[in-house]
Amino acid sequence: VAEQMGMELEIQDMAFDSLIPAIQSGKADFAAAGMTVNEDRLKNVDFTDTYAQAAQVIIVTKDSPIASPDDLPGKKIGVQTGTTGDIYADDIENAEVQRFNKGMEAVMALNQGKIDAVIIDREPAKVFVKENEGLKILDEAFTEEEYAIAVKKGNTELLDKMNAAIKELKESGELQKIVDKYITAE
C-alpha cells in the first residue's frame, strides 16, 4: 500500500497491544499487523476499507473434549494480549483467560497442558497447528472478522490515500496476490 502511494515504508516491530497507542501518540502512522475492525478499536482509531477476511479460531489438543465454542465456558483459555481473541474471551462464562505477549507462547502453554484452548487469528493458527502435530483447529470459528489498516482518528488525508491505494490494488488483482502470499498461505 505504501508503495502504491509512493511513500517509503519504515517497519517498527512492537507488541500487538501497543499498536493503537503508538498510532495515537504519533509514534506510528498506521498499523497493518493483522488488525481487525471492532467497536472498541473504532473508538480510538479509524480504519481503511477491508483488505481481507479474518476469523478467530480455537486451537485445542487432538484429544480435547472441546468440540465447539459452546464448550469453552469454565475452561482455561489462552489468548494473545490486545487481540480480538483477548477481547472476546472475557465474555466466555466462567472462563479463566490467560494472556500471552505472543501467540506462540499460548500454543506452548496448550502443549504443556497449562491451558485447555487458544483463541487466535485463523492464519497464524494454521501455522501453529502445522508445526505442532498434537494440535487441531476446531471446524467452527469463534468469530468472523475483517482485516483493515488502522490510522490515527481524524487523519482523513492518510485514510483517503490508503483507501485509494487499496482500491487500485484490489482492481489490479495485486492485493489478492499479497493476501495469498502473506495472509492465507498454508
Language-model segments: residues:
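A ligand-binding cleft/hinge motif common to bilobed small-molecule-binding domains
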Residues: 35-43, 88-90, 111, 116-143
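Ligand-binding clefts/hinges and TM-proximal coupling segments of bilobed small-molecule sensing domains
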Residues: 84-101, 133-141, 161-186
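Flexible hinge/capping segments at coil-to-helix
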Residues: 60-77
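Short, Asp-centered acidic motifs that coordinate Mg2+ and/or phosphate
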Residues: 25, 29-30, 116-117, 136, ...
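Extracytoplasmic small-molecule ligand-binding "clamshell" domains
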Residues: 1-34
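Hydrophobic residues within well-ordered alpha-helices
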Residues: 1, 23-24, 72, 110-111, ...
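Short helix-initiation/N-cap motifs at beta->coil->alpha
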Residues: 10-23, 64, 81-84, 98-112, ...
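Periplasmic-binding protein-like
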Residues: 52-60, 122, 126-167, 183-186
